[in-house]
Amino acid sequence: MALLPDKEKLLRNFLRCANWEEKYLYIIELGQRLPELRDEDKSPQNSIQGCQSQVWIVMRQNAQGIIELHGDSDAAIVKGLIAVVFILYDQMTPQDIVNFDVRPWFEKMALTQHLTPSRSQGLEAMIRAIRAKAAALS
């Protein structure tokens, strides 16, 4: 995740954007920074249901118990939203993920109020899937 900013810098950068067009472009840029997901990880078991776009999220726990998230989408804005979610969950254990509510961060960024209903539903589906996988590991 070295290519992505931390939570605080994400929020600062997001709030510096002058309008929603700039914010969308920033979200897309974040998605472009995600490492490429391996083809074998683009499997039905890693597919997130509830998203209009194709979304894959892979969760692995490293030797220190920290969750490493990897993901991809066939839609640029959705891939950027994946990056935002990954930034918020960065360096967390499974229990940290279960306990952490990302919604206040979305409110600070005024993120969900400018997403279409289908993108908001997809974002919620991603969060539910990550939290469910984390709960199974904790």
From Swiss-Prot:
InterPro entries: Cysteine_desulfuration_SufE, Fe-S_metab-assoc_dom. It is found in: Cytoplasm. Keywords: Cytoplasm. Pathway: Cofactor biosynthesis; iron-sulfur cluster biosynthesis. It holds the Pfam family SufE. It comes from the Bacteria. GO terms for biological process: iron-sulfur cluster assembly; sulfur compound metabolic process. The active site is at C51 (cysteine persulfide intermediate). Its main location: cytoplasm. The keyword Glycoprotein does not apply. GO terms for cellular component: cytoplasm. PANTHER family: CYSTEINE DESULFURATION PROTEIN SUFE, SULFUR ACCEPTOR PROTEIN CSDE. Belongs to the SufE family. Homodimer. Interacts with SufS. Participates in cysteine desulfuration mediated by SufS. Cysteine desulfuration mobilizes sulfur from L-cysteine to yield L-alanine and constitutes an essential step in sulfur metabolism for biosynthesis of a variety of sulfur-containing biomolecules. Functions as a sulfur acceptor for SufS, by mediating the direct transfer of the sulfur atom from the S-sulfanylcysteine of SufS, an intermediate product of cysteine desulfuration process. This is Cysteine desulfuration protein SufE. It comes from Escherichia coli O1:K1 / APEC. The lineage of its organism: Bacteria, Pseudomonadati, Pseudomonadota, Gammaproteobacteria, Enterobacterales.
